[in-house]
C-alpha cells in the first residue's frame, strides 16, 4: 500500500478467474477491491494460532489451527462483499473470501511446512474453488517433455545437463 507500489489491472477481476492472494498478495487484492491494509504495530512472524470460521478453503478443517505468518502490515478491513473466514490474535483478517468475484486471500503462508493444514487450503482452492482437476503427476510431465523433445529432435542425439536443485 506504499506510495508508488505496483497496481493490478482491474480487468483481471472481470475475467471470472478464481484468484488467491498469499501474504502481500492478499493485501494487494484487498486494496485493489476497496479493503484496507494498515501497519498495526503488532506484526507476526512465526507460528501463530488462527481461528477459522468456515470458508471454502477451510472445509472440514479444525476451527483452531497453527499457521505461519510473516508480516508487519495486514488487511484490517476486507473488501466490500468479502467475508472474513480466519483471524489470529494480531491479524483481524487472516483470510477472506469473496465468492461472487472469485477472490480469496490469506495473510499466512499455506505453502510452508510450518502451516500444518496449508496443503489442504491450497488443494481446496485449486479443486473446490477453481475447479482444477488433480491430474498432474511428475511422471506425466516427464513423459510429455520426452515426447516434445522427440518431436523436435527426431532421430538426432541430444546432450542434456539437468540440475536437481542442490547445486
Language model features with spans:
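RNA-binding accessory domains that recognize and position tRNA/RNA substrates
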Residues: 1-2, 6-20, 27, 31-167
Amino acid at each position: 500500500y506504499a506510495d508508488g507500489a505496483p497496481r493490478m489491472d482491474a480487468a483481471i477481476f472481470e475475467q471470472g478467474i478464481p484468484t488467491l492472494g498469499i501474504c502481500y498478495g492478499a493485501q494487494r487484492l484487498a486494496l485493489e477491491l476497496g479493503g484496507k491494509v494498515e501497519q498495526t504495530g503488532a506484526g507476526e512472524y512465526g507460528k501463530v494460532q488462527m481461528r477459522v470460521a468456515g470458508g471454502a478453503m477451510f472445509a472440514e478443517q479444525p476451527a483452531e489451527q497453527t499457521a505461519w505468518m510473516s508480516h508487519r502490515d495486514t488487511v484490517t478491513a476486507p473488501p466490500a462483499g468479502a467475508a472474513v473466514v480466519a483471524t489470529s490474535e494480531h491479524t483481524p483478517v487472516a483470510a477472506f473470501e469473496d465468492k461472487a468475484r472469485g477472490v480469496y486471500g490469506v495473510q499466512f503462508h499455506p505453502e510452508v511446512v510450518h502451516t500444518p493444514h496449508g496443503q489442504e487450503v491450497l488443494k481446496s482452492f485449486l479443486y473446490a474453488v477453481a475447479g482444477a482437476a488433480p491430474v498432474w503427476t511428475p511422471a506425466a510431465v516427464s513423459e510429455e517433455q520426452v515426447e516434445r523433445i522427440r518431436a523436435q529432435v527426431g532421430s538426432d542425439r541430444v546432450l542434456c545437463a539437468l540440475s536437481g536443485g542442490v547445486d
